[in-house]
Structures are given as C-alpha cells and as structure tokens.
C-alpha cells in the first residue's frame, strides 16, 4: 500500500573539516564548522508523510508507534469509524457499525495521473456490520467507500492531474486558558477563563469588577457561577466547604437567588433557550448534552491532556474520557478564584500541587499543528456525519428483512467531503514548483490561516510576532513580507510533531555539568521548566563545560549566566532555530533580519537554469535539502550501473535484482519552469544505496544549485547601477550562463454544441496556406515548429447559425447549387507576447477510450518551450536579500577587468550594503574568491593565531574548491582575512586580490585603472521568476469594454495603459493640449473618431479632428437623470446633436478596414468554447 513513503536518507555529520556526508558518493565540501552535530537532520518531509501514514494506519507507522510504547495504536481512519459506530435507528432496534479500513492498489501511477488529469487515489474498503437487536441477526459486508487520494513519496497529492500540497495549520489547542485584563473604569485587574473543546460549546468563567464570579455557557448571558454548581448537584454546604477560603465565592453565593438543583437547571435552561417552556428533564438533558455526552462535546485527546496538565488532575493515568467532568469544572473555578486572589499555587484533591498563573495564548505550548492526516480526518468526519443521517432515515423506511449494509450506506457525502477538501480548501494548495527548494519549503509550511484559524484582517501584532517558544520549532526569519507576515511560517530544521500535534525540538541532556549524547525531544511547555545552554558553549573532550559560568536561556527567553551544574540541556546544533531555506544562507549571522527574510524567500523564486552550478560558498545544507526535496533520483539498493541513457538508468543490485529508474525529461512544472533530470553516473560504476544517480532541476551532483557563481565587483559605474540596478557582462548572455527554459501548456477541446460538433481540422476558412504550413493533416502543429504570437497551434472550426446571405452569395448558391459550410474559425493560437518551439503534443480522444469531461470529444495539449536569455529588466538576487533589476548589459570589452585581464561578470553598487546591513554578501564575496583561487596557509613558522581553531585539513585547498560555512558556526572574520592573504597565485604567479579582499580594477573602455581598489570576489547570484518577458506589453489596437467603450486593462486582456487623473494634470502642466485631447478622445472612448483615425493612418491621410468621447455622453445622461436640461453648444452658439455612435457609416468603415473595434465579449457559452 503506502509503505516506504519516506526517503530514508541520513544527513551530514561533521566529525572533521571535510563533511563526511552519510549520503554516499556526495561531493566533498570543505567545512568551516567547529562543532560536531550529535544528531542527524530528520527526514525533511516527515511532517507530511508521518501524518498521512497515521491517517491510513500503515504498517510502518504502526511499528513506530509500538516502538514508542503505545500498546494498541489506532490509525486516523479507524478512529473516526470507531467514533461513528454504532449508528442506531430512532428506536434502538437496529445498528450499523464500521471497522477495518483497508486499501486496494492505486488505480494508476503518478506519471499517468499527471498525464491524463486523473487523481492519484486508491479504493477504500471498510467492513460494515448490521445488527438487528430484536432477532440478534448479524449481516456483515465489505463496503466500497470511494477512491481515497493517496500521498506520493514526495509528500504531495495528485488531484485532477495537478500536484497539490496540504499545508499544516497552526491553531489554538483545545484546553483551559486563564486570562488577565484591566478594567478601564476602576483599573482593577480582572481574570477570566475559557474551556475550549475540540468540538462543542465553550464554557467561560470570569470575575467582574463587582467581585462576583460568573459563568457564560455557549456564549450566552452571564450567570452566577454557583448556579452552574447547583445544577451539577452541589448543595450550598458543599460549595462553602470547597470554596470557603474565598470571599468572592461567598459573595457570589449570597447574591445567587436559586435555592436548589431544580431551580438552577431551569435558570440555565431559560438563558440558553429563551422562549421555550422549561422543564426539569429537558434542562437536565440539555446540560448533559452540552458538556458530558461524547457525541456533542469532545475535548479531544490533546484537550484532555492540556486540562489535566493545567489543573493537576488524573496525574499519571492514561487518557480515557474526552468529555468534561464535574471535577474539571470545580477545579477550573477554584484555579480562577485563587488566581484572582493573588495565590501562586494550589493543591488539588489528589495531593498534586500546581502553579497558578495566567496563560500566554501565543506560546507554542498552547498552539498546536493540525497536520495533513488530521485535516483530512476532520473532513471525513464531516462526510460520515452527513452519511449517518441518511443511514438513520433508510433504517426507518426500508423493510427490515431486506436491509443489508450496502442498501443503507450512501457514500456520496463522504466522497464529496474529501473532494471538497482537496479541491477548494484554503489549506490544499497548488504546489510551488518553481525549484526543488520552493517545493520542500511549501511542504514544511505552517499556516495560522484557514478554517478554524485566524483571518489576516483580524490577526493582531502579538500573534504575528516572534515568540521565545518558537526557538527550534518555527523559523523566526522565513515568513512572507505582505499581509500574511507572521501568520505563515516554516518548520525549523530539527523540529518534529508529536502525537498531540505540538512541535518538539531536540536537546542534549546535561548531567552534573557534563554534556551527554542522550537526545530528548521537548515541547515548548517542557522546555520552560529547564535551563538550556547554546550549542557552541565550550566543552572539553569529555563533554564537561570548560567555563564556570555558562550562558543559558530560561523561561520567557531571558538570557543569563549560571554555573555549569545548573544546566539541564544543550542545543544540538547552531542551525536548530532556522528553517531549511534560511539554513542555506551563508554568513546569516552577519545579515540584518529583514534582509535575511528576503534572502530566504527569494531563494524559492530562483528559476532552474540550463546548466546548474552548486555554490562555491555553501552551508552544508545543500545536499540534504536536494535529496529530501525528491527532484533527484536516488539508488534504492547497492549495486552496479548496468545501463545509462538520457531517459533511464538501470542498476544491477547486489541481491541479484535489476531496477530501472525513468528520468523526467523537459517536463513542465506547476510554474512553467523546466523539470529535467540527467544522469551523473556511468555504466559499470558502483553505487551505494542512497546515492544520487541523476540530477534534477537546480541540482549539481546531488547538491542544491539555485544560481551561478559570478565574478562580482562592488562599485558604482557611471550611475548605471544607481538604486539597486545591476550591470551585467554580455558574456552571460552569449554563453547562456543565466539562460533558463520555460514551458507553456496550451489546451483546446472539441465539444458538442447546439449547432453540431466542433471539429479539429486543417481545413480552416479564410486562412492562407502559409499560416497552415506547420500543421499536420489533423490540423495540429508539428513538433519542432518555431511559433510566434498569433500562429495557429491547433486548427478548429465551430458550426455557426445561418445568417442573412448577401445578393452575391445568393447568386453563387443558385449557380453552383452547393451550401457553403457555415463554420467559423475557433483555432488555438499562441497568445500575444509568447513564442517558442513546440516540444510536445498530447491528444486525448473519446474514440481511444480516454476519460474526458461530458460533452468533450477530443482534447489536444501543445507544449511550447522558450529559451530565455538574461535581458535588461530581469530581476537578479543574492542569498542575503540583495536584489536588483538589470539596468544595462555591457559588452565584455567594456567591463572593468582585473590586472591579469579577466573581466568581471557583474557590477553591484556599494550603496546597496551599508544601510541594509547585510554584510554577509561581502563576506561571501571574499570567501568565494578564496574558494575559487584555492589557498595554502604558511605553517612553517607555526600555525598563525587566526587559524588556531581550524582543523589541519583546512590548511590548504586547491583552486575551485567548494566550501561550507554553516549558519552561526561558519568562517570567522579573522579566518577570512587570513585566508585572503594566503590565496594561491594565478598561472602567471600573481595574486589578483589583496589581503583586504580588494583589487585594482581597470576600466574596460579606456584601460585606465579606477582610482580606488575595489572589492572583487565570487558571489552566488540567482535569476528570479520575475522576468521582463512576462511583464513587457504593448498595444496598437485591441479590445474595448462594451460598457465604457474604453480599452481594457492588463496584459492578459491585451489592454492599454491607464492614463489617470494625475497623468492628465502632468499634461496640463506642460501645456500639451493636443496630446491630452488625443489621449482623452481617439486613444480612449471616441468611438467614431478612432475608426476615422485608423482609416486615415491606413490611407496615409492627415489625422482628422477628434469627436466627442463616450464618457462625456455618460456625464450628460447623469445630469439629465438629475432632471437638469443640458444642451451642448458649439463655439458659435449652435446646438450640437448628441447621437449614439452606432451609425452605419462607422460600421461600414470598420468592416472595410478589416478591424473589429468592439470588445469581443462572448455572447454565449458556445462562443466561449
């Protein structure tokens, strides 16, 4: 079924300078890390795959649960079926129960589902058991419950052929929450408490400014809390015995007018059901249903756990009940009263002492994750509850003898609920496939939005802000910049989700000042109770802290120094607090947080280039991120490569089995980028299990490679790189260094219409042979054809209704006696502004038994690939939030060059660094030069001080080395300065860059040196998805809006540019009266004038006088609607008649010129097709 979902690939452990990747065959990256990580990075997709395996109850999940110590683990589907069972009829004489959910094989492979627009799903079967309680008869059947979407190995779902991701949702955990507010009028501190269930009515208690304790049931009117206690069967004496210590409770009891349980119940009933006649029985039932019946009220396991923990109840006992108990209510009231009276602890009836304090709702101990499994489970629960109603009705209407489980069950509501979730839920999202990192980050995203979460309009600053409890759980850097800032986050590298949905992070246990190798995963609540040291606290070889005072974090994120024996735990890694994308920024510790945020986000926007190149300066995270993203091909077993081609790789495993891996070739991703895999192994080569054997998009030798290493000079250049503009060398254009391939999909279908069937054909009316040159006999463009905007990709004709014939046509009909074919051209054409080469065609036809929507006979898809070279206006960025638009591309000979004649590739402005405080880019530039040139530290006279912390392996490295500088544990400034002075000379024996990282550059135009030395080095530059080709747009004539008669807006509609109020003022200020008149009339909504002008331009005549714009006529109509008599007079006082612009001359002129100046707003569905 679903076993083996996760790529079991282990991470990198750094025991010495060369990263000994536990991924075999990985490229060696020289690492500047000083610390050993005792724990490998967990599977980066586990947050998705583990949750789904819990839902379907896979064997792998079950075994892991048993290993954790669970006796009888229950999967998500089993759990929801157990909740539903048994469904009883209204008399209780019949019942239907469900058990044992299981899956058949999936219907089609992932590739086939993508190709044919199918859903990757497996049939779900359950055992349904019908019991007739009167006769004791039992009927059992296996029932099909619909096709259930399955998760792919990459943690995604294929829904109707598109790849989607279900994002984990951050919500407030069910439980009991105490709050504190200050009354504005009396300035008294007031306290309140909410009991929030997973499902059911809220119960709220509060102390008001008159010092009475009140209760609100299900958000209705407030009542004295003693009314609720009496309704639960408490007498005045019992209340006094339990709460006698509290004046405010005694005061509330005095003000309470109800005398006993019955009166209290009726009082509550009147508040909850005003207008209905109260009876004791109905009041009792109502209260029980509200809080004490599992069908109506569910705290959920996590809610029960939180309530027990907060109030000190049932300590050490397993969680059984999920409803409220009487003791819960009483303990909550006592806790509230003690909190209000300023007490700091209370002892509950079991002898457990609990601290009394206010809760912080933004703390990660009070916020949990609803992962994909739980989100789908909730949706199935909704579908099953709808089905339950149908089953109950059918039990009463059908003949008891003939009833079988199959006749009772209607699976439609369940199937519809699942479909609705995957198709329309805010948390089921179109996967971000711009590059492998964007896909990986999307799967690890945490969203506070969505059903049951926050809305971006109502979310305040507190919930968006970074909280101390986020440490090691949610990245404080990576979040969107817009209105969603702080509401959408990313899971930290080492974080995992526990069975209750709380995020845990690992720590190393410290005992008596000695760091052990024991790893404990702690939730935010548990971490608050401990003292935690940071990962780089100095220790000796035995793990004992070398300093007497150690810097630690305590509750609330406060930092202080304590003695070594007070430390409980220590971080496992310096990169523990950040997400995958943030952990890929070298020298992150030298960047301002705002720019680091942009850097992390912009890495996700990098487009895959024709030739990927891994960064010279990495962080050691590149390999693991690329493998877990799933876009590279990994060998499953150890063996020998038997055969390699561009399309597949065959491995002969050591156990005698042969396995072929198919490679994706030039496939289109969700974002139109090119996903292409290529082998990196040779026939006869030995490979280990887990080794990368083929690269995907944006990877090189299995490492993430989002951009290019370019030789950068940081200097102003003639003002052409002012305001973040970038100057590039023409070499990058000519040699396709920053060239990317983009693939667009164009689709057309042939339907049945009221006038007959549409036809895909080469026989298109009124089209020349030149236009049809690239179409085959079916009317579909050939593969390899170069196409431009307006070219026909697929010829299609649609029948049209009979029209009035002209006398000439009638004469022709009479002579030749044939009825000309009444069809119109509805061919698929290349949209404006697009061009490229046809690389693929897929034809689906009803005749070939392909699944097509109702009414569609044939469907054709054409894939057009575009090779986009870098050009002016494209956006480039580094990894430190340093982004800019290309302002100028210079010939290579004009670029500044080094003393040996090497021209630089890119010039960035110096002003982009100081106020943005992203110094990481400068350090990266220096280290990039060191890595490219190679280095050799002179240790003949002893190791220099600056190199004392470097291991021996780092004393020298050849040219073109790749280095890793992990976040918070990378190369230090002193080491960089020393390495710059130790770089290897070039082949002429010269060192190009000085020890301060600068070089004398020469002007390419004059050959003169620039007056000052310039920082030169290698920086990793990304080409972002904001390409000028997608944005540039021009219009001569085009569609007009039917209503305003003005041109439409936007590139998609082939619209014009808006000339607004302020632009008109600018024209007035310049006195450009005729230009302004032209803009407001013939270029806009003067319907008569624009046709005449077009005619004049075609015939080469002078431009005629403008007419009256349509908007002026609208103004007149508005004034007339206000009962004002408005006349328009010419300059000599003669009245001008305002005619509507639909005269025949206009239409005839337009028809003669072959132009259509009206908006093609489709009149019918057939026209749209």
Swiss-Prot record:
Comment field (misc): Mutations in the RRDR sequence (residues 423-449) confer rifampicin (Rif) resistance. Rif blocks transcription initiation but not elongation.
Record function comment: DNA-dependent RNA polymerase catalyzes the transcription of DNA into RNA using the four ribonucleoside triphosphates as substrates. This subunit often mutates to generate rifampicin (Rif) resistance. Interaction with RbpA partially restores Rif-inhibited transcription; once the subunit is Rif-resistant however RbpA no longer stimulates transcription.
Protein name, entry field: DNA-directed RNA polymerase subunit beta
Cellular component, GO, one term: DNA-directed RNA polymerase complex
Oligomer and partners: The RNAP catalytic core consists of 2 alpha, 1 beta, 1 beta' and 1 omega subunit. When a sigma factor is associated with the core the holoenzyme is formed, which can initiate transcription. Interacts with RbpA, which partially restores Rif-inhibited transcription.
GO BP: any one term: response to antibiotic
UniProt gene name: rpoB
HAMAP family linked to this entry: RNApol_bact_RpoB
InterPro entries: DNA-dir_RNA_pol_bsu_ext_1_sf, DNA-dir_RNA_pol_bsu_external_1, DNA-dir_RNA_pol_su2, DNA-dir_RNAP_su2_dom, DNA-dir_RNAP_su2_hyb_sf, RNA_pol_bsu_bac, RNA_pol_bsu_CS, RNA_pol_bsu_protrusion
PANTHER family: DNA-DIRECTED RNA POLYMERASE I SUBUNIT 2
Keyword Plastid: no
Keyword terms, alphabetized: Antibiotic resistance, DNA-directed RNA polymerase, Nucleotidyltransferase, Transcription, Transferase
The protein's Enzyme Commission number: 2.7.7.6
Organism of origin: Mycolicibacterium smegmatis (strain ATCC 700084 / mc(2)155)
Stored Pfam families: RNA_pol_Rpb2_1, RNA_pol_Rpb2_2, RNA_pol_Rpb2_3, RNA_pol_Rpb2_45, RNA_pol_Rpb2_6, RNA_pol_Rpb2_7
Enzymatic class: transferase
Family: Belongs to the RNA polymerase beta chain family.
UniProt GO molecular function: DNA binding; DNA-directed RNA polymerase activity; ribonucleoside binding
Result after altering residue 432 to V: Rifampicin (Rif) resistant
Reaction it catalyzes: RNA(n) + a ribonucleoside 5'-triphosphate = RNA(n+1) + diphosphate
């Amino acid at each position: 079924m679903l076993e083996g979902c996760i790529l079991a690939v282990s991470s990198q452990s750094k025991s010495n300078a060369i990263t000994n990747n536990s991924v075999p065959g990985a490229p060696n990256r020289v690492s500047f890390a000083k610390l050993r990580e005792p724990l490998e990075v967990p599977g980066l997709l586990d947050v998705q795959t583990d949750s789904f395996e819990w839902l379907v109850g896979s064997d792998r999940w079950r075994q892991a649960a048993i290993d954790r110590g669970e006796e009888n683990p229950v999967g998500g589907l089993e759990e929801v079926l157990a909740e539903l069972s048994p469904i009883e009829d209204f008399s209780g004489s019949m019942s239907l129960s469900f058990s044992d959910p299981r899956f058949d094989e999936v219907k089609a492979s992932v590739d086939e589902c993508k190709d044919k627009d199918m859903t990757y799903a497996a049939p779900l079967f359950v055992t349904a058991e019908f019991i007739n309680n009167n006769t004791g008869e039992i009927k059992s059947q296996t029932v099909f419950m619909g096709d259930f979407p399955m998760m792919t190995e990459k943690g995604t779902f294929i829904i109707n052929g598109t790849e989607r991701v279900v994002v984990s949702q951050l919500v407030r955990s069910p439980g009991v929450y105490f709050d504190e507010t200050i009354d504005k009028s009396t300035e008294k501190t007031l306290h309140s408490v909410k009991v929030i269930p997973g499902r059911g009515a809220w119960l709220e208690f509060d102390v008001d400014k008159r010092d009475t304790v009140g209760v609100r049931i299900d958000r209705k009117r407030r009542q004295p809390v003693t009314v609720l206690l009496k309704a639960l069967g408490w007498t005045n004496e019992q209340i006094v015995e339990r709460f006698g210590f509290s004046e405010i409770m005694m005061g509330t009891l005095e003000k309470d007018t109800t005398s006993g349980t019955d009166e209290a119940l009726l009082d509550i009933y009147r508040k909850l059901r005003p207008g209905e006649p109260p009876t004791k029985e109905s009041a009792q039932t109502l209260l029980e249903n509200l809080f004490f019946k599992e069908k109506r009220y569910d705290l959920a396991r996590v809610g029960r756990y939180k309530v027990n923990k907060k109030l000190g109840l049932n300590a050490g006992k397993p969680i059984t009940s999920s409803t409220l108990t009487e003791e819960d209510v009483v303990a909550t009231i006592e806790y509230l009263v003690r909190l209000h009276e300023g007490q700091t602890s209370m002892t509950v009836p079991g002898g457990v002492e609990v601290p009394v304090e206010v809760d912080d709702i933004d703390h990660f101990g009070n916020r949990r994750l609803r992962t994909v499994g739980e989100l789908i489970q909730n949706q199935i629960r909704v579908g099953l509850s709808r089905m339950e109603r149908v089953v109950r009705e059918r039990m009463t209407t059908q003949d008891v003898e003939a009833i079988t489980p199959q006749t009772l069950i209607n699976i439609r509501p369940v199937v519809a609920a699942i479909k609705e979730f995957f198709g329309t839920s805010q948390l089921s999202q179109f996967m971000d496939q711009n590059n492998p990192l964007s896909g990986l980050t999307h799967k690890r995203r945490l969203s506070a939005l969505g059903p049951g979460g926050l809305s971006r309009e109502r979310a305040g600053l507190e919930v968006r802000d970074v909280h101390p409890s986020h440490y090691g759980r949610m990245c404080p850097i990576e979040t969107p910049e817009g209105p969603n800032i702080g509401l959408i986050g990313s899971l930290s590298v080492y974080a995992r989700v526990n069975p209750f949905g709380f995020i845990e992070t690992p720590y190393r246990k410290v005992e008596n000042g000695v760091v052990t190798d024991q790893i404990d995963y702690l939730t935010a609540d548990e971490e608050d109770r401990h003292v935690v040291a940071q990962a780089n606290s100095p220790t000796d070889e035995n793990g004992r802290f070398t300093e007497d005072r150690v810097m630690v974090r305590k509750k609330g994120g406060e930092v202080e120094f304590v003695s070594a024996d007070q430390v409980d735990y220590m971080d496992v890694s310096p990169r523990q607090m950040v997400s995958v994308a943030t952990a890929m920024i070298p020298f992150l510790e030298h960047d301002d947080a705002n720019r680091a945020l942009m850097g992390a986000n912009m890495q996700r926007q990098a487009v895959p280039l024709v030739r990927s190149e891994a960064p010279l300066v990495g962080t050691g995270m590149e390999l693991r991120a690329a493998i877990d993203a799933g876009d590279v091909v990994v060998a499953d077993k150890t063996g020998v490569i038997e055969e390699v081609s561009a399309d597949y790789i065959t491995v002969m495993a050591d156990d005698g089995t042969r396995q072929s891996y198919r490679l994706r070739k030039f496939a289109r991703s969700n974002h139109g980028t090119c996903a292409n895999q290529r082998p990196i192994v040779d026939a006869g080569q030995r490979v280990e299990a887990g080794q990368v054997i083929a690269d995907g998009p944006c990877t090189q030798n299995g490492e993430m490679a989002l951009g290019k290493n370019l030789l950068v000079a940081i200097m102003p250049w003639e003002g052409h790189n002012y305001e973040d503009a970038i100057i590039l060398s023409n070499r990058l254009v000519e040699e396709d260094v920053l060239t990317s391939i983009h693939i667009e999909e164009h689709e057309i279908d042939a339907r049945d219409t009221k006038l007959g069937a549409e036809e895909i054909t080469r026989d298109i009316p009124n089209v020349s042979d030149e236009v049809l040159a690239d179409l085959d006999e079916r009317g579909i463009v050939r593969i390899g054809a170069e196409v431009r905007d307006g070219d026909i990709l697929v010829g299609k004709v649609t029948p049209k209704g009979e029209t009035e014939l002209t006398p000439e046509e009638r004469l022709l009909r009479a002579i030749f006696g044939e009825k000309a074919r009444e069809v119109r051209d509805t061919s698929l054409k290349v949209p404006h502004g697009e061009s490229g080469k046809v690389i693929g065609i897929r034809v689906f036809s009803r005749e070939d038994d392909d699944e097509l929507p109702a009414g569609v006979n044939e469907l054709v898809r054409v894939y057009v690939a575009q090779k986009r070279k870098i050009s002016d206006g494209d956006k480039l960025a580094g990894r430190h939030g340093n982004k800019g638009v290309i302002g100028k591309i210079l010939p290579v000979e004009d670029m500044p060059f080094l003393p040996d004649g090497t021209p630089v590739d890119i010039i960035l402005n110096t002003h982009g660094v100081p106020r943005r405080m992203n110094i990481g880019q400068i350090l990266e530039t220096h280290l990039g030069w060191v890595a490219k040139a190679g280095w050799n530290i002179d240790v003949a006279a002893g190791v220099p001080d600056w190199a004392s912390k470097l291991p021996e392996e780092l004393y020298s490295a050849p040219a073109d080395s790749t280095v890793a500088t992990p976040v918070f544990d990378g190369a230090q400034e002193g080491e960089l300065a020393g390495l710059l002075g130790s770089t290897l000379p070039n082949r002429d024996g010269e060192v190009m860059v000085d020890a301060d990282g600068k070089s004398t550059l020469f002007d390419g135009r004059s050959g003169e040196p620039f007056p000052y030395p310039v920082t030169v080095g290698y920086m990793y530059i990304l080409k972002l998805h904001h390409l000028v080709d997608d944005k540039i747009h021009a219009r001569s004539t085009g569609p007009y809006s039917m209503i305003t008669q003005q041109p439409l807006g936007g590139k998609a509609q082939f619209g014009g540019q808006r000339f607004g109020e302020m632009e008109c003022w600018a024209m007035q200020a310049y006195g450009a009266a005729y230009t302004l008149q032209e803009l407001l009339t013939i270029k806009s909504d003067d319907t008569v004038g624009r046709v005449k002008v077009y005619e004049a331009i075609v015939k080469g005549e002078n431009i005629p006088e403008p007419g009256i714009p349509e908007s002026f006529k609208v103004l007149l109509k508005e004034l007339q609607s206000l009962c004002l008599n408005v006349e328009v007079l010419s300059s000599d006082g003669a009245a001008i008649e305002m005619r509507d612009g639909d005269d025949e001359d206009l239409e005839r002129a337009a028809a003669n010129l072959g132009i259509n100046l009206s908006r093609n707003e489709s009149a019918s569905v057939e026209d749209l097709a």
